[in-house]
């Protein structure tokens, strides 16, 4: 039996990955992390989507310690989300160590349930500049987990080389475009669906959706070519 664990936030990217995983694996578990993020609604959204899609199990883990250590606009209500980069070249929404912790815990969970695949929706094409969304980081984490647990494990990143328009096309491939558009929470200001339309996350999401809806055939063709050439 093929089992997978999906790192699941209830946002556009992880929901698209979850929809795909449910088609490709016999048993799918979702894992969501409560790290004291700005909007607790994220967790409620993730729980509802996971239930509606019928995952085998949905685990919500309390990792509040991350909030104490990582100062970010996503972990502090008094820090407004900014479109400007900080002096270190990163947006102030970057939560240092977040994906290191998430992938480690997802790997441990996969070990316990006998799953050999962890799926995450990180992306290096259209992304916010987070270093822990890059392909070389994920590969390094994969190596560390395999060596540290002495067990075969693959971290799968279906969106790594897709732009946002192609990510929308992927959701549409699985007849889930409206599900993703209407029910996910990607907005940094905590508005479900199309969001506030003003934060960096909403800007990226809307630009990708507009590009896909205005050029469906071309974007879908590009997606299929990447799937065939890169095994996405």
UniProtKB/Swiss-Prot annotation:
Its EC number is 6.3.4.20. ATP binds at residues 8-18. Pfam families: QueC (PF06508). Gene3D superfamilies: HUPs. One of its GO terms (molecular function) is zinc ion binding. It is an enzyme of class 6 (ligase). The keyword Zinc applies. Zn(2+) binds at residues 187, 196, 199, 202. The keyword Lipid metabolism does not apply. Pathway: Purine metabolism; 7-cyano-7-deazaguanine biosynthesis. Its cofactor is Zn(2+). It catalyses: 7-carboxy-7-deazaguanine + NH4(+) + ATP = 7-cyano-7-deazaguanine + ADP + phosphate + H2O + H(+). Binds 1 zinc ion per subunit. Belongs to the QueC family. NCBIfam families: 7-cyano-7-deazaguanine synthase QueC, PRK11106.1. This is 7-cyano-7-deazaguanine synthase. The gene is queC.
